[in-house]
Amino acid sequence: MYKFDPHGEPLDSAFRAIAIDQLDEALSDLAQPDTSGRSIVHEARRRTKKLRGLLRLVRPGFPGFDRENDALRDAAASLSHLRDREVRRETLRALAKWRPVSLLERLLAGSTEPAAHDDAAPLAAFRERMVEVRARAGQWALSRPGLETLEAGVRRTYRTARRRMRKARDLHEPTRFHDWRKSNKNYGFTIDLLRKAAPDLLGDDVEVIDKLSNALGQHHDLVVLRVTAAQGHLPLSGPEQLMELDALIGERLGELEAEAFELGRQVYAERPAALTRRIMSYWKSA
């Protein structure tokens, strides 16, 4: 359950119910074997992102935002090493699929999965932090009327993502794309949470936002891979292989940036005030 319902319970109690459901699912995921192709680490981090997306939507009316957002951020950070390990393999695999050259095949062949017991301590730390958040979630409450909070939250998440897209376009720096990636993800969570107000219309929005998130996510992963290679943390035989890998990454980054800006023009075409009016009109007329 990751949806506000315009015909459902009051927004204040719905906020708590969604949060508690996500927290309980996150804790349950830790005890489940990996049967979906997604790792426990992937699922744990996905839940924390959804929770933080929820908090950002209600931030204008939630006094506990800073404390709980920081707690969830720290929980996710406890898994960052495991996440980086997994993503490195997936990034190499995706790059090899895009351009199947022998260098990438060799790097993939030399990349091994660490033993599962290496995950135990970080996962235990993650669980401990999530249990602490879960213990407080039942007392979370909004300090502003629900509709007022949602309206301010929609405006804030959209405006932030739109501004960061423009920064990425103007400055073309990896950190600017990283900031845009995070804020676009948050805006996607906002629209997903409000989707029941106009399932068909907002469903189309979510689809394009997801495509943009995928392009920006691949971009970020490749930037990290490029830094990892430059720091000597990949089994490259010498400068020639480093230059070859760097050139491949640079070419792919250029393609992803072009794709991201094209999708961004669709997602962020409206001014923040107009977008907010449109979304809230769906909610009020549902």
Predicted regions and their residues:
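Function-determining surface determinants
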Residues: M1-A286
